[in-house]
Amino acid sequence: VLSGDDKSNLKTAWGKLGGHAGEYGAEALERMFVAYPTTKTYFPHFDVSHGSAQVKGHGKKVADALTTAVGHLDDLPGALSALSDLHAHKLRVDPVNFKLLSHCLLVTLANHLPADFTPAVHASLDKFLASVSTVLTSKYR
């Protein structure tokens, strides 16, 4: 459960991404593909090389979904319901992959926002991404 401090930390940190959210989403995907090559199996039709337009496009989708989630912290299940259905029923993504991408997002954000990535912000982002992952996997049962 996200506390009031977590919600404040998230809104402040996410606001500092500015117009870079899509870029950071793509970078996190690239990190995931390099660090966890088996994740590429969910993107057989993608050029997963560095700087690929497809990775950039999907990175923007990831960032947009997270931006939506940050805007609906009190109703993540409602805000992410369609995305949860998509990943559970159509794409059938192994739930562990959400944790892998979450880790890569944390690394990417820490790299780009070192002064803002305090232990409290790190903890809030980690809790948020875990909550998003839980919602995205909730319809697998």
From Swiss-Prot:
The modification N6-succinyllysine is found at residues 7, 11, 16, 40. One of its GO terms (molecular function) is haptoglobin binding. The modification N6-acetyllysine is found at residue 16. Red blood cells. Keywords: Acetylation, Heme, Iron, Metal-binding, Oxygen transport, Phosphoprotein, Transport. InterPro entries: Globin, Globin-like_sf, Globin/Proto, Hemoglobin_a-typ, Hemoglobin_oxygen_transport, Hemoglobin_pi. Pfam families: Globin. O2 binds at residue 58. Residues 1-141 form the Globin domain. It comes from the Eukaryota. The modification Phosphoserine is found at residues 3, 49, 102, 124, 131, 138. GO terms for biological process: hydrogen peroxide catabolic process. The modification Phosphotyrosine is found at residue 24. Heme b binds at residue 87. GO terms for cellular component: blood microparticle; haptoglobin-hemoglobin complex; hemoglobin complex. The modification Phosphothreonine is found at residues 108, 134, 137. CDD domains: Hb-alpha-like. Involved in oxygen transport from the lung to the various peripheral tissues. Belongs to the globin family. Heterotetramer of two alpha chains and two beta chains. This is Hemoglobin subunit alpha.
